[in-house]
């Protein structure tokens, strides 16, 4: 490679790492512990940190569902606000260690291992409101990250091969995600930890990767991935979570547009369907604080607790992607004749790292229970017939006993008379024989009577139990339809075989100190989320056909559906996504200033990007999910809701849903003041993100129109080992759909590297 190439590539990458570390990781330069013996040499880097984060203000009522005391039309995104008032929400000790080994006798081979761990004393406490699975994600964790073997192949051209868990970064993106750099999914929750570093948040994946430097100007790369890894999203109810039904701990999606709170996992009730249907749990968590749910029968509408499946759709088993079929190739060309510009060309075949939501409709409970009704009624008839037969037998036996008693009375009288008047009468013996015979007959009748009486009692008990079962089912017939949601489920899916084609560049503009880099990615068959409310309503059409055809409410609406997905059948799969081609250009400009305004240097970085989905249908054909939509986009929604008791509910405007084009920009700056006092360096920094226009379809979610984020902070560094920082983040704009708008926070940390 030429010096100009090294300079060009190095400065652009340094600028990227510099800004990312300033605002995402706050990492300092470490001085590794080096060691060696006769066989190996290596170094061991360690970074230990301690910090906390504080919520500035209490949550607003508009961020809390109506059933939980707020004004929001959903309880599916308010757990974080219920769990965290103003004050401390994270209190963390953390460590990350890097081990690098090289073999003296085999210099081509090296090993790299990275591990990290943390404990959040605030979220790991015993009385934390988080679920057990959510607490395991944000309360404490220890894991290995990178762990790979590197081999430099002895050849006429440099060839490097790596095998194991590793991070492979392609493309030229800086801040805006979902570009070319998709090989490694992100562990979002790691970014939330005070003192977090980028190296901890990128999830290494098991790869066989290779790179070859064919000439000074041309290099090739390739990889094959052995195991699919997914993006780790915020656990349900954690501070940065905005959806309670996704992530670790997310188990239910609630109906009722905010009128019912989530199931109370500490209070359980018998499942009335369990004795009669296979595949349903014996116990169910309850729903507390029912505000208003006209779909429930009047007797249950004001109950302090309701069965969870009266208003909650449970989460089903995820449909995960295959571990095979993911690979990619890249070529890099350094064009000295084009202003020392480096170009990159990329192809990847990969599976989605981001989840999309689909549904399986509920079971036809009434039809499924019909054989049970028939069997119970048939059983009752048979039991009653059996009791009737037993009663007939008892009547016959009772008649026989009466006849035997009459005969005994005559015989006993005759015996008594002879014994008193003629004791030696020859007929007395015959009378006593007849007396014994009649006594035996009576005893037999009594035994039969006892047996039949016991049999009748058993039949009567069976009849009472069967009639009780029938009574339970009959009494619940009016509400069986309301138990339907609990037999449905929503599922996460990770569609396969997304193909990405990309091109990138990076260069400098003369001697201006300005670096420019950018990329354009074209992806084929990207799964985009259909509006989840459309999916929800479609899932309810089997039990409420009027949602599929509004003509039953108003003849003028005949043929009009409440959902763009149309009517569905019972126990059927409803795909919640559609595949589209997605184009994403993004460009970054970096300006490195020398000594000025008393500072050693300062850096300004700006990135602008856009997401385009050329074939996305118009919103009157099919609406796709955008951040923060919690109501239907159907213009009929208010009238339908009013007819079903939700007179005050409204609907989402078309502007709320995903657009075919969206764009925004990111700005960041940092100033370095060296040796301010006693060898301490100070670096004030500011970052600004602005989503200018359009809403990016989920699960991509790059831009939400008019959303803004501002972060200001200062970092102090001492002897490249000690570092402390404090920063403040404010969320602004589009408050009705930006669920972070009231979660401004302050964080501080101290870090030691050695």
Q: Which positions does each model-derived feature cover?
A:
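Membrane-embedded beta-strand positions of outer-membrane beta-barrel proteins
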Residues: 44-46, 113, 161-163, 210, ...
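Transmembrane beta-strands of outer-membrane beta-barrel pores
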Residues: 50-56, 117-121, 165-169, 226-230, ...
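Flexible, surface-exposed loop regions and adjacent strand-edge segments
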Residues: 61-67, 128-133, 178-183, 228, ...
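Flexible glycine-rich, low-complexity coil/linker segments exposed to the extracellular/periplasmic environment
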Residues: 62-82, 235, 239-240, 247-320, ...
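Detector for outer-membrane/organellar transmembrane beta-barrel domains
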Residues: 88-92, 348-350, 515, 523, ...
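Outer membrane beta-barrel
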Residues: 106-256, 350, 664-666, 693-694, ...
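Outer-membrane beta-barrel "beta-signal"
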Residues: 742-754
């Amino acid at each position: 490679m030429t010096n100009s190439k090294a300079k060009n590539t190095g400065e652009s990458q340094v600028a990227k790492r510099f800004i990312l570390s300033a605002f995402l990781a706050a990492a300092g330069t470490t001085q590794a512990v080096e060691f060696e013996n006769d066989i190996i040499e290596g170094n061991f880097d360690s970074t230990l940190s301690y910090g906390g984060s504080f919520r500035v203000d209490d949550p607003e009522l508009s961020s809390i569902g109506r059933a939980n005391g707020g004004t929001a039309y959903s309880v599916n995104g308010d757990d974080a606000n219920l769990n965290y008032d103003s004050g401390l929400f994270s209190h963390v000790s953390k460590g990350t260690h890097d081990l690098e080994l090289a073999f003296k006798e085999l210099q081509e081979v090296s090993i790299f291992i990275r591990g990290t761990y943390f404990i959040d004393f605030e979220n790991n406490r015993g009385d934390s409101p988080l679920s057990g699975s959510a607490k395991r994600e944000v309360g404490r964790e220890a894991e290995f990250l990178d762990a790979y073997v590197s081999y430099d192949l002895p050849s006429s051209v440099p060839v490097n091969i790596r095998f194991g868990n590793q991070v492979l970064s392609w493309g030229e993106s800086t801040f805006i995600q979902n570009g070319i750099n998709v090989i490694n999914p992100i562990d979002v929750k790691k970014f939330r930890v005070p003192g977090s570093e980028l190296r901890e948040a990128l999830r290494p994946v098991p790869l066989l990767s290779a790179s070859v430097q064919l000439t000074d100007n041309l290099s090739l790369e390739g990889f094959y991935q052995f195991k699919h890894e997914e993006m780790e999203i915020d656990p349900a109810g954690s501070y940065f979570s905005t959806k309670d039904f996704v992530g670790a701990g997310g188990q239910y999606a609630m109906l009722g547009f905010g009128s019912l709170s989530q199931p109370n996992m500490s209070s359980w009730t018998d499942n009335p369907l369990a004795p009669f249907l296979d595949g349903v749990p014996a116990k169910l968590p309850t729903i507390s604080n029912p505000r208003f749910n006209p779909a429930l029968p009047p007797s249950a509408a004001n109950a302090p607790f309701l069965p969870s499946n009266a208003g909650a759709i449970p989460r089903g088993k995820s449909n995960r992607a295959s571990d095979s079929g993911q690979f990619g190739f890249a070529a890099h060309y350094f064009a000295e004749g084009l202003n020392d510009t480096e170009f990159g060309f990329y192809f990847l075949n990969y599976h989605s790292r981001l989840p999309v939501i689909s549904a399986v409709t509920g079971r036809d409970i009434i039809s499924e229970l019909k054989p049970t009704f028939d069997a119970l009624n048939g059983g009752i008839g048979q039991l009653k017939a059996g009791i009737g037969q037993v009663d007939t037998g008892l009547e016959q036996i009772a008649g026989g006993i009466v006849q035997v008693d009459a005969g005994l009375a005559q015989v006993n009288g005759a015996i008594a008379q002879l014994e008193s008047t003629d004791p030696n009468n020859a007929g007395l013996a015959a009378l006593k024989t007849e007396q014994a015979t009649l006594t035996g007959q009576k005893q037999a009748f009594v035994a039969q009577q006892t047996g039949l009486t016991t049999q009748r009692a058993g039949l009567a008990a069976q009849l009472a139990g069967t009639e009780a079962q029938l009574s339970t089912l009959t009494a619940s017939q009016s509400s069986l339809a309301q138990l339907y949601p609990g037999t449905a489920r929503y599922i996460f899916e990770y569609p396969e075989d997304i193909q990405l084609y990309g091109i990138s560049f990076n260069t400098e503009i003369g001697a201006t100190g300005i670096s420019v880099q950018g990329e354009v990615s074209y992806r084929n068959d990207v799964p985009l989320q259909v509006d989840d409310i459309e999916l929800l309503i479609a899932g309810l059409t089997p039990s409420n056909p009027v949602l599929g055809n509004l003509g039953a409410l108003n003849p003028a609406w005949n043929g009009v559906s409440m959902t763009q997905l149309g009517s569905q059948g019972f126990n059927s799969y409803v795909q919640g996504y559609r595949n589209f081609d997605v184009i994403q250009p993004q460009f970054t400009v970096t300006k490195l200033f020398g000594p000025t305004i008393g500072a050693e240097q300062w850096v300004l970085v700006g990135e602008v990007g856009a997401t385009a989905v050329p074939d996305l249908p118009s919103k009157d054909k099919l609406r796709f999910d955008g951040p923060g939509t919690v109501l239907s986009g159907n213009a009929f929604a208010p009238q339908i809701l009013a007819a079903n008791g939700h007179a005050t509910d409204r609907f989402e405007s078309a502007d709320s849903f995903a657009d075919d084009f969206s764009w925004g920009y990111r700005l960041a700056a940092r100033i370095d003041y060296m040796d301010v006092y006693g060898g301490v360096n100070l670096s004030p920094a500011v970052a600004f993100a602005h989503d200018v226009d359009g809403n990016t379809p989920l699960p991509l979610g790059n831009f939400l129109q008019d959303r803004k984020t501002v972060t200001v902070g200062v970092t102090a560094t001492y002897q490249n080992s000690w570092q402390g920082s404090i920063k403040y983040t404010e969320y602004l704009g589009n408050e009705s759909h930006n669920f972070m708008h009231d979660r401004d926070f302050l964080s501080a940390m101290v870090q030691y590297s050695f």
